[in-house]
């Protein structure tokens, strides 16, 4: 595909398809590739330079705020702006979705990219082949990405048992990782709606009946369902991830209700084929295809809805090291898209509400953790409190409020579970303590991206099939 940038004209009707942002260059999933700028299309060149520039601006700006007389006034003003936006998010009323389809049900293609998933792939395949949706109206494609374990044999046997199950095996020379696998199978699919699940997913039998009606609104380009942790009771890390997912989906629904952006989370994402085609498929130049696709859909004037119920369950990582690898990948991919599409964001291609929401999110999620280090160093040097204290306090407060509200909303959906406010508060406090790891992850990631050559590295999460 050509690597041309967006046209200068801002008219929606005159926009070129977003597939012009992508290229045919790709990298293998498990190898570490030092990416030279000259090998990338123009939009993805210079990521390290962009990251270094942002880091320099953030550090110098933070230091300057400690040295000027009006620094504290500026921070209070920033906190006020963020606080007003936060109040809007908290009090926004989530949309009520139409639950019934008017007319015939659309055809759905379900895609799963799998590599060495012998422990979980059979359970998922049987799960997906027995969903509550009319026979002949959906298909299941599992892409075996050159597995070296028993995955190919398991899939071959299951394909004999289920007519709707189709298997595509990729060669050892295939490139692009998960994005490459999804792009390779896409031309073979028939669905108007494309669903993507991870190999460890556990899908509610009525999932399609809840999700498909949301696509009746023509502007909806994708839907993300809530992710739940199947092994949440295992240890501190999995319990923390459970609370984190409740916070994430609550923020997602509140942001979309306010006119902001909804985001894809990979597992449990549903994309309208028309929207996916207009964006050029999945980007093989990123380590987080879902986060990248989120931006490209919104830049192409599509909306993304987020659904609390039903949830797709997945295995949470169980060790601090596994969590560190996973969250560093998420942080790098999330930050990288701002570097890739910054000019289109500033041109307000998404619309004012979405652009404002995205900038507020970037400021809180990426810029504030990056600024925390020079702020702390200056505070220690000058024997003064950290300048960013008010903004940090607001961010922590929003996290606590959102996590409690998210956990409460989940319990309301699951009417058979009754948890007292005290139990929810304990879960929120534990989740808040767990969430502090993001401060270290974000600050280290933004610094690392400024100095080290870009590495398209994917560390496979091992799935054991132990989640209940």
UniProtKB/Swiss-Prot annotation:
Nucleotide-binding in keyword set: no
Enzyme class: transferase
Any matching Pfam family: Glycos_transf_2
Keyword Lipid biosynthesis: yes
A GO CC term assigned to this protein in UniProt: plasma membrane
InterPro entries for the chain: Glyco_trans_2-like (IPR001173), Glycosyltr_2/OpgH_subfam (IPR050321), Nucleotide-diphossugar_trans (IPR029044)
Example GO molecular function: magnesium ion binding
Residue stretches spanning the membrane: 51-71, 72-92, 358-378, 387-407
Family: Belongs to the glycosyltransferase 2 family.
Name the UniProt record assigns to this protein: Beta-monoglucosyldiacylglycerol synthase
Lineage, highest ranks first: Bacteria, Bacillati, Cyanobacteriota, Cyanophyceae, Nostocales
């Amino acid at each position: 595909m050509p690597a041309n940038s967006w046209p200068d004209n801002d008219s929606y009707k005159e926009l070129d398809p977003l597939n012009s942002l992508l290229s045919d260059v790709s990298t293998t999933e498990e190898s570490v590739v030092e990416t030279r700028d000259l090998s990338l299309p123009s939009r993805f060149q210079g990521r390290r330079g962009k990251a270094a520039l942002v880091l320099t601006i953030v550090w110098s700006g933070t230091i300057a705020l400690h040295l000027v007389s009006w620094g504290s006034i500026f921070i209070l003003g920033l906190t006020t702006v963020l606080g007003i936006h936060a109040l809007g998010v908290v009090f926004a009323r989530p949309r009520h979705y139409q639950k019934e389809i008017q007319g015939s049900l659309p055809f759905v293609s379900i895609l799963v990219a799998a590599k060495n998933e012998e422990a979980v792939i059979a359970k998922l395949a049987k799960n997906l082949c027995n969903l509550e949706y009319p026979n002949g109206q959906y298909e299941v494609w599992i892409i075996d990405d050159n597995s070296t374990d028993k995955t190919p044999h398991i899939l071959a046997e299951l394909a004999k048992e289920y007519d709707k199950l189709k298997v595509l095996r990729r060669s050892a020379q295939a490139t692009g990782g998960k994005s490459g696998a999804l792009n390779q199978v896409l031309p073979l699919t028939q669905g108007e709606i494309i669903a993507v699940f991870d190999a460890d997913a556990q899908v509610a039998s009525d999932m399609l009946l809840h999700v498909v009606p949301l696509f009746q609104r023509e502007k909806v380009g994708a839907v993300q369902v809530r992710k739940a942790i199947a092994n949440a009771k295992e240890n501190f890390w999995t319990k923390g991830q459970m609370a984190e997912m409740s916070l994430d989906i609550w923020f997602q629904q509140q942001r979309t209700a306010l006119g902001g952006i909804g985001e894809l989370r990979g597992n449990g994402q549903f994309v309208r084929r028309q929207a996916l085609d207009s964006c050029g498929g999945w980007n093989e130049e990123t380590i987080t295809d879902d986060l990248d696709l989120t931006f490209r859909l919104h830049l192409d004037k599509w909306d993304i809805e987020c659904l609390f119920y039903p949830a797709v369950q997945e295995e949470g990582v169980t060790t601090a090291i596994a969590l560190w690898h996973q969250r560093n990948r998420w942080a790098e991919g999330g930050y990288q898209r701002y570097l890739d599409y910054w000019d289109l964001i500033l041109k307000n291609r998404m619309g004012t509400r979405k652009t404002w929401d995205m900038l507020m999110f970037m400021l809180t999620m990426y810029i504030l953790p990056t600024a925390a280090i020079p702020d702390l160093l200056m505070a220690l040097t000058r024997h003064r409190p950290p300048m960013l204290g008010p903004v940090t306090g607001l961010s922590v407060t929003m996290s606590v409020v959102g996590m409690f509200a998210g956990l409460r909303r989940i319990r309301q959906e699951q009417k058979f579970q009754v948890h007292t406010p005290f139990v929810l508060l304990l879960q929120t406090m534990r989740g808040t303590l767990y969430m502090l790891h993001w401060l270290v992850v974000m600050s280290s990631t933004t610094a690392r991206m400024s100095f080290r050559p870009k590495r398209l590295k994917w560390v496979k999460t091992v799935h054991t099939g132990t989640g209940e």
